[in-house]
C-alpha cells in the first residue's frame, strides 16, 4: 500500500461528514446511511463531549458505523484516537494540535490517511513536512457543535493558506451550511466538513444532496 495521492485525497474531501451518537436526534445509523445515500465522500467518527459513548459501547458503535461506510465504499476516519483506528483497521485518523504528534501518528498508521487540524501557516507547514495527507482549516464560521474551538478564521483565513503557497488538500471546518458552502470552496478549500448541517437536518439525505450540489457548482 502507498500513501494516497493528492488528487484522490482532494476528491475524497468534497463532502466530509463528521458525527458521533450525541450529534443526532434521530438514529445515528440511519442518519449515516441517509448521508451516504445523499453522497458524502468521507466519514469521520467523532464520539466526544457530553453524552458520548465510552468503553465497549463506543467501540461497538464505531464498528457499526464502519460497516455501513464499507457498504458504500466510503473511507471511515477516526477522530483523535489512533489506538481505536488501529484496532478497527480504519482508513485513517484525524488529529488536532493538542492530540498525539503527527510524526508518531504517521509511524503507527503507516500509509493510511492522516488529517491534521491547523490554525496557522506554521502549523500547516509542520503537518505537511511530517506526513499529513490533508489539513482541516477553521473554524471558518462560528459553531456551537464544538465547544473547544479556536478563533473564527473566516474564508479570508482559508484563502491566506493558499496565498502562502499551501497546496496540500484542505477541508474547511466549522459552522458550514448549505448557504455558505460555495464561499468556502471559492476561498480555496477542496471540500467542506459538516456535523449538524447533516446530523440535525430534517432529512439527512436531502441536506447532503444539497451540500454535494453546492460543492460541485463551486469547484
Curated annotation (Swiss-Prot):
| Chain residues that bind Mg(2+) | 80, 99
Q: Which Gene3D superfamilies match?
A: Aldolase class I
Report the superkingdom from the record: Bacteria
| Cofactors, names only | Mg(2+)
Which EC class does it fall in?
transferase
Any one Gene Ontology cellular component term annotated for this protein: cytoplasm
Catalysed transformations (reactions): 2-[(2R,5Z)-2-carboxy-4-methylthiazol-5(2H)-ylidene]ethyl phosphate + 4-amino-2-methyl-5-(diphosphooxymethyl)pyrimidine + 2 H(+) = thiamine phosphate + CO2 + diphosphate; 2-(2-carboxy-4-methylthiazol-5-yl)ethyl phosphate + 4-amino-2-methyl-5-(diphosphooxymethyl)pyrimidine + 2 H(+) = thiamine phosphate + CO2 + diphosphate; 4-methyl-5-(2-phosphooxyethyl)-thiazole + 4-amino-2-methyl-5-(diphosphooxymethyl)pyrimidine + H(+) = thiamine phosphate + diphosphate
Enzyme Commission number(s): 2.5.1.3
> Which pathway, metabolic or otherwise, does it act in?
Cofactor biosynthesis; thiamine diphosphate biosynthesis; thiamine phosphate from 4-amino-2-methyl-5-diphosphomethylpyrimidine and 4-methyl-5-(2-phosphoethyl)-thiazole: step 1/1
Locate the residues binding 2-[(2R,5Z)-2-carboxy-4-methylthiazol-5(2H)-ylidene]ethyl phosphate: 143-145, 175, 195-196
In the record, the note on similarity to other proteins reads: Belongs to the thiamine-phosphate synthase family.
The identity of this protein, by name, is: Thiamine-phosphate synthase
Amino acid at each position: 500500500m502507498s500513501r494516497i495521492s493528492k488528487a484522490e485525497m482532494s476528491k475524497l474531501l468534497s463532502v466530509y461528514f463528521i458525527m458521533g451518537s450525541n450529534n443526532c436526534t434521530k438514529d445515528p445509523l440511519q442518519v449515516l446511511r441517509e448521508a451516504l445515500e445523499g453522497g458524502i465522500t468521507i466519514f469521520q467518527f467523532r464520539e466526544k463531549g457530553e453524552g458520548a459513548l465510552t468503553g465497549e459501547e463506543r467501540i461497538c458503535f464505531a464498528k457499526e458505523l464502519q460497516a455501513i461506510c464499507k457498504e458504500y465504499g466510503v473511507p471511515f476516519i477516526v477522530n483523535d484516537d489512533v489506538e481505536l483506528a488501529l484496532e478497527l483497521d480504519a482508513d485513517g485518523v484525524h488529529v488536532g494540535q493538542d492530540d498525539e504528534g503527527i510524526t508518531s501518528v504517521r509511524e503507527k498508521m503507516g500509509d493510511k490517511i492522516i488529517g491534521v487540524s491547523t490554525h496557522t501557516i506554521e502549523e500547516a507547514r509542520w503537518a505537511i513536512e511530517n506526513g499529513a495527507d490533508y489539513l482541516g482549516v477553521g473554524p471558518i464560521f462560528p459553531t456551537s457543535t464544538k465547544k473547544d474551538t479556536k478563533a473564527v478564521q473566516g474564508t479570508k483565513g482559508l484563502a491566506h493558506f493558499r496565498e502562502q503557497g499551501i497546496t496540500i488538500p484542505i477541508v474547511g471546518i466549522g459552522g458550514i451550511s448549505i448557504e455558505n458552502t460555495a464561499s468556502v470552496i471559492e476561498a480555496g478549500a477542496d471540500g467542506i466538513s459538516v456535523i449538524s448541517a447533516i446530523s440535525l437536518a430534517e432529512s439527512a439525505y436531502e441536506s447532503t444532496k444539497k451540500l454535494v450540489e453546492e460543492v460541485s457548482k463551486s469547484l
